[in-house]
Curated annotation (Swiss-Prot):
The protein, known as: Decapping nuclease RAI1
Reported function: Decapping enzyme for NAD-capped RNAs: specifically hydrolyzes the nicotinamide adenine dinucleotide (NAD) cap from a subset of RNAs by removing the entire NAD moiety from the 5'-end of an NAD-capped RNA. The NAD-cap is present at the 5'-end of some RNAs and snoRNAs. In contrast to the canonical 5'-end N7 methylguanosine (m7G) cap, the NAD cap promotes mRNA decay. Also acts as a non-canonical decapping enzyme that removes the entire cap structure of m7G capped or incompletely capped RNAs.
GO MF terms, alphabetically ordered: 5'-hydroxyl dinucleotide hydrolase activity; GDP binding; metal ion binding; mRNA 5'-diphosphatase activity; phosphodiesterase decapping endonuclease activity; RNA binding; RNA NAD+-cap (NAD+-forming) hydrolase activity
Keyword Nuclease tagged: yes
Species of origin: Neurospora crassa (strain ATCC 24698 / 74-OR23-1A / CBS 708.71 / DSM 1257 / FGSC 987)
Record's subunit section: Interacts with exr-1/rat1; the interaction is direct, stabilizes exr-1 protein structure and stimulates its exoribonuclease activity. The interaction also stimulates rai1 pyrophosphohydrolase activity, probably by recruiting it to mRNA substrates.
Keyword Transport: no
Domain of life (superkingdom): Eukaryota
GO cellular component: cytosol; nucleus
Length: 412
């Protein structure tokens, strides 16, 4: 009879553990190595912020009203002050909602990167490619332990590509406690999209009719349409390529690529009437700040609404001023420098942990004091990287390996 034992090879620095499963003959059946990055104590990440490279947009893409992918800025929106005293629930019954049960992986981001590389004839120099949402979870980890997360990662051509583990996301939704509030949760989620519709124009103000502007409260809300910015940024020694949705622009894009863009992030929150609500808003500000910080969005406009969804006030926040504003409150719920330093430490550690191909899992259990990383597939890249992107990279490498011809020299 074959028996199994588990030999624990040990813990060192509280950051790495390895499990090897063996049978009675002493031959390995399989091996799983789990590395763990400790979040606590958070105090070790305090102090002056690590150097951050200003996010610079180098490409963009859009989804149209049917959520069809488009290279370019077709779905860019312009900010224009919304009317107040508008019911944010209005039009919910006609809401055109994107089906996010479909796993879109990194497909759109990779297609956009490949298009950029075709124009420049060289690969981007990022150490990590991912969505803004994944980096937001990582940066918020020291102060947000209620919800866990899972991500899939793979190493390809020296770069780590990270996506959300869609199966975990769907399972977490299915296991959520039933909502017992007076207003359905779906309606409250709709309020944010309604506020975006009330606050944006599809063209600059000078090209938009007064009738269109004044009729915005009656417009059908469609969250399938999106503009996504792709930026190059960096935290410490780690260069990042991040893609993420941008709600609107304040004026217009600069002519020179890489120059700062006056983006606007739109958010909603309950009117603050007591200390508990003030504390909740301060916690919300952390996510607001991280999301805008990562893409270089300088301005956040919050629509404050009543408990039943009436928009009563808008307030503008400067992204770079939010951490200091929170710090001045005496007993801050979070610290921006700590978020940056934690992300720097984790990303450097991750780059030394994911060092070969296969599919890796990045996992943080709810209320856990560590982030685990372990391999779930020994070879390949799963569905994280598309065949089209890999074929393009092979083609690019072959092109770069070719010696210059006389024709090429003449063209130059």
């Amino acid at each position: 009879m074959i028996t199994r034992q588990v030999l624990i090879l040990g813990h060192w620095n509280s950051r790495f553990r390895a499990f090897i499963h063996i049978h009675s003959a002493g031959q390995p059946l399989f091996s799983t190595m789990t590395a763990a990055f400790p979040i606590q104590p958070v105090a070790r990440f305090a102090g002056k912020s690590e150097l951050v490279k200003r996010p610079k947009e180098f490409a963009c893409f859009s989804y149209d009203a049917d959520h069809k992918f488009l290279l370019g800025a077709q779905s860019l929106k312009w900010y224009y002050t919304p009317d107040l005293n508008v019911d944010l629930s209005k039009g919910f019954e006609s809401f055109i909602k994107h089906d996010d049960s479909v796993d879109e992986h990194l497909d759109s981001l990779l297609t956009t990167i490949a298009d950029y590389e075709q124009k420049t004839s060289k690969p981007i120099d990022a150490h990590i490619v991912t969505w803004r949402g994944m980096m937001t979870k990582i940066m918020a980890a020291p102060f947000d332990d209620d919800d866990g997360f899972e991500m899939n990662a793979t190493l390809y051509r020296g770069c780590i590509f990270i996506e959300e583990n869609h199966a975990y996301k769907q399972a977490s939704r299915a296991n959520e406690r039933p909502w017992n509030g007076p207003i359905p949760q779906e309606v409250m989620q709709y309020w944010g999209y309604k506020f975006e519709t009330l606050s944006t124009l599809p063209k600059p103000w000078g090209q938009t009719s007064r009738d269109f502007i004044e009729s915005r409260p009656d417009h059908v809300v469609n969250n399938k349409e999106q503009y996504c910015s792709v930026v190059r940024t960096g935290i410490g020694k780690t260069i990042l390529c991040i893609g993420g949705e941008v709600d609107a622009i304040w004026d217009d894009k600069p002519r020179t690529q890489g120059d700062p863009i006056n983006w606007v992030e739109l958010k909603t929150s309950a009117v603050i009437q007591n200390e508990r609500q003030a504390n909740n808003f301060e916690r919300k500000l952390m996510k607001f700040w991280i999301q805008s910080f990562l893409l270089g969005v300088p301005k956040i406009i919050v629509g404050f609404r009543t408990q039943d969804g009436l928009l009563v006030e808008t307030k503008e926040f400067r992204t770079m001023e939010i951490p200091l504003m929170v710090k001045k409150n005496g007993r801050p719920k979070w610290d921006g420098d700590t978020c940056v330093n934690f992300a720097n430490g984790f990303l450097e550690w991750l780059r030394h942990t994911i060092t070969d191909e296969g599919v890796w899992r990045i996992k943080r259990r709810p209320r856990s004091a560590e982030i685990e990383v372990f391999k779930v597939e020994e070879v390949g890249h799963g569905d994280i990287i598309t065949d089209e992107f890999m074929n393009w990279r092979i083609k690019l490498e072959l092109r770069q390996a070719q010696p210059p011809t006389e024709d090429n020299e003449t063209e130059e």
